[in-house]
Amino acid sequence: MKAAKEARAARERILETATDLFANQGYRATGINEVIDKSGVAKATFYHHFPTKADLCLAYLKTRNSSELNSIKDFIAKKRTPWSRFLGVIESLEPWLKANQMRGCSFLNMVAEEPDPKSPLRKEGKKHYESLRNLIRKLAVELVESDPQHYGNLDADAITDEYMVIIGGSIALAEIYHDAWPMRQGIDMVARLVD
């Protein structure tokens, strides 16, 4: 029991260290030895949990996917109307970006560093955005169904596609400018999608 707890703790330390390093210096610039040194684990422990750097990165992305989507869902769960939940997805991103020092999206950053379109890392990035897309589509359908007289002429699939483009552009520009104004513009643009 104690050994299992220690193994989980070591794995978590490795992931926390990798999260910090990948976010601050990128995937390619982060070496395995640096992760091992900064996490304070033995090489054998590292390789027991993560046989390759790609395995570590994949675990990092899966953890990020879960935490980011849960954060968005928690944010929109506090909203009372279909309209506020729909808009809440992009509204949730400004505080998230500020908390991450405007480093942008882990998935976009990782995909930019991984040229192979068949890479598991790129596939995980796409999976993240597909999960986000499914959430937005669900909220778009909920919005249309909440007031068919007002929103009945809207195409939930088209709105979802436009919303995704706005999110991607807003996140990328917030990282480039190291400022939140692109997110605020993105919020206004999403609001206009359904007006």
Regions found by a protein language model. Give the residues of each.
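Basic, helix-initiating cap at the start of DNA-binding domains
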Residues: 1-25, 29-41, 55
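Amphipathic, non-transmembrane alpha-helical scaffold segments
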Residues: 15, 61, 65, 122-133, ...
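Short hydrophobic/aromatic patch on the recognition helix
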Residues: 40-50
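A secondary-structure capping/hinge motif
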Residues: 54-56, 110
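Hydrophobic alpha-helical connector segments
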Residues: 59, 63, 73-101, 151-153, ...
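Amphipathic alpha-helical packing segments from all-alpha helical-bundle domains
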Residues: 69, 74, 84, 99, ...
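Amphipathic alpha-helical segments used for helix-helix packing
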Residues: 99-120
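Hydrophobic/aromatic-rich alpha-helical bundle segments in the mid-to-C-terminal region
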Residues: 120-129, 145-191
